[in-house]
Structure formats: C-alpha cells, structure tokens
C-alpha cells in the first residue's frame, strides 16, 4: 500500500515548493528564482511562423551609381550611414553612444571668469597635451589637492579639450579608458579611476555645468560599479559584513546594490528599492561607497534619456533630489573603502590574507616562460614604461627572450666568464668569416652545442657579419643593477666586454591561500 504524505501549504521553508507533477515520487523541489523572474513564453503563433517563412525582397543598390561617385562623395555617404546607424541604435537602447547629442553652448556664461575660477598655475601639464599623449609620462604630477581641483579652471580646460575632439579621437581615448578600467591590476588603481570620475562629476555639480553624455569621464561611470564590485568581491565580504551576525544578508544587499542576481525570496527589499536608497542608509562603508557610484550612474542615465527626448542640455541639480552629489567629497570613495578593510578585525586567517593582498600593490608572479617562435604575434609595451619592464618580453618577432630583474634584490648570482673559452670562440668565429656558406653555419652550431653541453656558468657568444639580427637576443645586467640589452646586429664585429649578470629575486612570505570566496553565494556569483 502506497503512503501519500500530505503537507500543509504554509509549512515549506523558503525556496522550497511542491512538485505538482510528481508529488508522490519526488516529494519537494527546490526552486531558485529572482523576484523579477518571468518565465519565457515558448508558444509561437501560426502567424509568426508564416511570417518568418516569407521571403522578403531586399532592395539592391545599383553598382553603376556607386562607381560614378567620387572618393569625397563616398566618404560623405559613409558618414551619413554611420550617423543613421547610431541614431537607430540610440532610439533602440536610449542609452548608448550618440554622436550628435546636443550639449549646452560653451559660451561666455561658462568661462573661468564667469564661474569665479582662478587660473591653474601648478606643476600639472596642460590638459590639451595630456589628452594628446593619451597616457601619463614617467614622474608626471597627477596628484592634486582638493582646492586645486575645485577652485581652478583645470577641469574646465579638460572639458573644453574633450568637447573639441572629433569622433575618432574620442572613441580612441574612450576605448583606452574602458580597457584600463576593466584590466586594472590592483584595487588602488581602480579606486583612483573611480575617484577621478566622481571628482569630475562633483565639479559639474558645484559649478552647475551642463552634462555631456559622450564625455570621457561621464560615460564610464556606469561601468565603474561592476569593476568596484569585482575588486571587492575578492575578499570574504560575508566575514567583513558580519559585525552584527548578519554577514550573509549584508552581502546579498551589496549584490543587489550593484545589480547582481540574488536568489533569496525573503530579502526585505527588492533590487530597485535598494538602489534608490541614499548612501547614509547603509551600515557598512563599502556599501556606502558603492551607493555613491550607483546613484551617480542612475542620475547620468536619466540625463541621457532626457537629452534624447528633449534635445536640450541638462544639469545634475535637476535630477539629484536627495542631494547625494552634495554629500560627496573628494577622496570619499577611497577613504570609505580604506576604513572598511583597515578597521575589520576577525580570527579568520584567510580573510585577513585576502585583505592584505587586496590593499597591496600589484606584483607579477611569473616563474618561467617559453621561447616562442619568431613568427609569433608581437606584444608591444608602452614606451613610457620603465626600462626594467621593457626588457620583460613574453614574445617578440625579433627578440624571443625572457628576462626579469627587480630592484629589491635579496640574492645575487654572479656568473663568471671563462677567458680561455672566449679566446677559442673568437678564433673560431674569425676563421668562419672567410667562409659564408653552409659549412660555417654547421661549425658554429656544433660549437654551440658542445658549449651548452658543458657545465659552465655562462657562454659568451660573438658575432660576425653572417649572423642575422633576428636570431637571438641577450640581456646583460651590470654591477650597478642597471639593465642593458645587447642585441646582435648585422655587420657588427665589435667584441662584447665582460659583463657580470645579476638575477634579482623578490621573496615574499606567503600565508594560507584559499580559493573559497564568499561561499554562501558561490553558485550564484558571476
């Protein structure tokens, strides 16, 4: 006799629901869904099927008319097509980049004299030169005080320079900024970029400047909340938010604030209600910092939608009803995050280790790499990078080398060169200069194989005119720890001087390494 269990409707725990189809066989079934989840309608009507089966005729362009156009007319046609595509894209999404959005006229009412701003006379470079170079130079001053940012015309000049860029230039620096933000190496660099955009936003609020939707700083605020969440999510936030014993709930609120899915039907507020709250309503500083970013992004999104509708300039003061922009001060995001992690105390070694690594600067952790083939793609480094990074090449079409040195050396390995073998190599190479055929290459290869087979500290290679410049490259380190790369070039018969190679190693005390991050919602993390 089969027994049937009868359950009351109100006795099920959260997230658990009866299986109507197989109650006797399966019992209970766990269902995970968000509050705004709506099942997709899989029914396809007969009219829709017939509509997709139809063959819609496409109007073909006359190639003869296109051939008759000049190059200038074709360029104009290309620009018209791009503008039409962006107009349709903006009408569809209402939030994407729109090239011809109207902005407020930058006339006499928005000059430094009219706004009461004094001229900047500090050490920072001219904004026009900074935007032209796209990246900061070595030892360039980028740290500025609050008074220098808010009471001078420096940011106003940045706004003028950004407004004067054409579409291609703006897209280029915009792509550089998005790439730099999404590939940030450390939490400190991410907070610096976020703080820069928030200060620029605050500058527009204080001086009541019109918002440009395609501005470099304004456009990237909307994606900063995700980078902020990804960097902070590396820590054990359930432990960081566990001061009152509700770390799991506070972490879910943190996910709702960023727009991440939360699979808990018993949350007190929905995602929309959490994002509408002011920063002061949250308990933890990290949540308050994210609330500032989310509020600024929401205001900018509303401004973009209003500009698309009215084609008129808009201002922050008309959309910030809670005066959140007035509460923000320069450097507040970094200060809130620092207070959150520096004041956290717990007995979890893994949590403390993750916080220590998050707050520390980025360091490369690479122990070896391969000699990639010559036809491999070339990875170029920025010319403004320090010299020690320029010698660290993973792959290059002409330099298949890999070397690394650190200034903080704790152990040095000195490789002594043997003078006798150098003399033998020199005699052999001078004898090879007369023969440029196949025998010369075979002798050289055999000689190198013999030298590599012997257990010696290092081998000094000499060159002749027959050695191609793309064969090999060696990096020598002088005694003063300055790195010099000696590349073998064609028609270069100079003798290499004795060099002492130093290999600098930077050791760090490694504690326990755990991969379990915020395990309460590990299945739901993005």
Swiss-Prot record:
It holds the Pfam family Herpes_UL69. The keyword Transcription regulation applies. Transmembrane segments: none annotated. One of its GO terms (cellular component) is host cell nucleus. One of its GO terms (molecular function) is zinc ion binding. Keywords: Host cytoplasm, Host nucleus, Metal-binding, Transcription, Transcription regulation, Virion, Virion tegument, Zinc, Zinc-finger. GO terms for biological process: regulation of DNA-templated transcription. Zn(2+) binds at residues 239, 344, 346, 351. It is found in: Virion tegument; Virion; Host nucleus; Host cytoplasm. Immediate early (EI) protein that plays many roles during productive infection including regulation of viral gene expression and nuclear export of intronless viral RNAs. Belongs to the HHV-1 ICP27 protein family. This is mRNA export factor ICP27 homolog. It comes from Human herpesvirus 7 (strain JI).
